[in-house]
A protein has these predicted regions:
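Flavin-dependent oxidoreductases
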Residues: 35-128, 132-143, 152, 158-161, ...
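General beta-strand structural signal in soluble alpha/beta enzymes
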Residues: 26-28, 61, 127, 166-168, ...
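Helical element adjacent to the flavin cofactor pocket in flavoenzyme catalytic cores
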Residues: 2-38, 42-58
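C-terminal catalytic lobe of FAD-dependent flavoproteins
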Residues: 14, 112, 121-122, 133-255
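Active-site catalytic microenvironments for nucleophilic, acid-base chemistry
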Residues: 18-22, 69, 73, 211, ...
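Hydrophobic (often cysteine-bearing) scaffold residues that line and stabilize catalytic clefts
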Residues: 8, 69, 205
Length: 255
């Protein structure tokens, strides 16, 4: 068995940039306030937002901790409940990045895979997370108790973690559903759930994306876009270049 690491933020931006390159439009800071089928069902959806109403042939519900809200608007007869599960992390400086050379997991439990210790693609050391159910779906602040738990449990698998080299701590929320499974499928004509995606959601993301695309393709009788461009030009990191390559960049863009 093999494993690998990736920057989740960089991956997300890369996918979003490629989507925009292929015609996707993003509407940021736009909250869905309601939705209902058009023309009595089967012909699409009206999505009411705080910036007006949108009409669409299909909705893919990938709303994270709020996926239950959208699901229940579309299918109140089969309600879903998403619980926000907070995970606290420590991020350590590059000087601690070689403390471990691969991801060290603990035995998984009822709340997930436990506290891990892993290097990052940027050379830092990442320690966490906890798994604490919270009522507030915006509760991304760390707590003293949560960070104490990370300190204690990480030491069970890796000794002498240099936590004094912590440069920041942070927390994120997982979208937990009581049945402990991903919910992916068309629950109403033109409404596709992609909900309750916990670990290993990141590793599964390419396969989930392909699966959802197949569902939408079948529902709307779509064909592949002939001019789709699968490439994305990465963001150059000057620190990774030698002096000659940096000098060439400066020559090309002296301003």
């Amino acid at each position: 068995p093999t494993g690998g690491i990736v920057c989740p933020f960089g991956l997300t931006f890369a996918l979003a940039e490629n989507a925009a390159k292929n015609g996707v439009q993003f509407r940021f800071d736009t909250k869905v306030t309601g939705l209902h089928p058009l023309d009595g069902g089967g012909a699409g959806w009206a999505v009411e937002t705080d910036h007006g109403t949108l009409e669409t042939r299909c909705i893919v519900n990938a709303a994270g901790v709020y996926a239950d809200t959208l699901h229940n608007m579309a299918d109140a007869a089969h309600p879903m409940t998403i619980t926000a599960r907070r995970g606290d992390y420590f991020l350590l400086d590059h000087t601690a990045g070689q403390h471990v050379r691969h991801t060290v997991f603990q035995l998984p439990g009822k709340y997930g895979k436990g506290v891990l210790v892993t290097p990052t693609v940027h050379g830092n050391l990442l320690v966490g997370p906890t798994a604490i159910d919270v009522d507030d779906k915006e509760a991304t602040a760390t707590t003293a108790a949560g960070l104490d738990e990370v300190r204690e449990k990480s030491g069970l698998a890796v000794k002498d973690i240099p936590l004094r080299q912590t440069i920041t701590s942070f927390a994120g929320l997982r979208a937990h559903e009581a049945r402990h499974d991903f919910f992916i499928g068309e629950i109403a004509p033109g409404f596709v759930d992609c909900a309750a995606i916990e670990s290993p959601g990141l590793s599964s993301a390419p396969a989930i994306g392909a699966m959802v695309a197949d569902i939408v393709r079948g529902s709307l009788h779509l064909h592949n876009k002939p001019d789709f461009d699968p490439t994305r030009r990465g963001i150059l990191d000057p620190k990774a270049l030698d002096l000659a390559a940096r000098a060439e960049l400066i020559r090309q863009n002296p301003a």
